[in-house]
Amino acid sequence: MKRIYLDNAATSFPKAPGTADVIKTFLEKDCTNISRTTGQKGMETYERITNLRSGIAELLNLSTPESVILNSGATESLNLIIKGLFNPGDHVLVSSCEHNSLMRPLVQNGISFSRIPCDRQGYILTDRIGELVRPETKAILICAAGNVSGAVQDIGTIAEIAKKNDINLFIDAAQNIVDLNIDMEAMGIASVVFSGHKDLLGPEGTGGVALRKDIAQTIRPLISGGMGSKSDTEEIPDILPDRLEAGTQNIGGLLALAHSFSYRVENRKQLHEQERRVTELLFRGLESIEGIKIVGAPLDRPRTDVISITSDKMDIADISQLFLERYGIETRVGLHCSPSSHKALGTYPTGTLRFSPGPFTTQEEIGITVDAMKEIING
């Protein structure tokens, strides 16, 4: 049975061509520890990872590539921001459609928050932000694209509101960093969190955060330890990115991310158009089936490839299992680590069945999926 993978919102598959080869070559031939080992491979590896920082900074129009921090991904980056910048009792604004990677650190660390309402399609009601701002509000933290609704938020308008109220805006772009068209300098954005294994088509356990330099210089590090620089002191050095990258990194993974990032950016138009075609095809096919209801962003508003559904004919968990057992189709069912999103969308506590095709999903695979849904629903 052919594998049909429709869970790219959880992790991308297939990865960018050649990504696995980069990791294999590093482990078998080029293994080294950057900023530690004195050797040709170490210098070459350092340069490749530096180029990755520069590429991300260029994508986001950030003039300080040294403040692009590379780590295990979006969850670690959000923990760095929340634990490094805020204190118990501080107040922030979040949307009512946030992921647990943001909400759990806020709750764990006693940070007070107000939720900006979203509509039933998952879009932030930007005209409600101003009324929630308090004198003690420190920041707005939002996910740029919903992993349940697929809704892409109006970052430009939210950035203007943040500027007007003189508060920092922090963006979680784990789902769609390349196509957001973020300009950190012009928009005054404090940070952009990104994941390597989703939109960037790289390996799991990679990602990071692009920080405005003044924040990168003052944020409390999440961890501390050896960095390969300023080893004569037991104090954390003020060098960037070193002060926020203690310990040996996932070097092979970051080299693979550098490769997949270049591929993703160089082919962004082609990949976006392919993803859009299969997403629209799947959306149209599913909405035509009696007993299936699409939840979240419509096709005529800014959206990603995420399509969530509910059904009044069958349990969505049963549908997901039948997809796998009968057709080899992989989806995700439940709350998707975002109970607040489901509360806002009216699908809590059952959740939704989520499809998320990717740039390598074929129209044939979408056709098989739609036909499979018809067979399952009609028994």
Residue ranges of each PLM-predicted region?
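Pyridoxal 5′-phosphate
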Residues: M1-G379
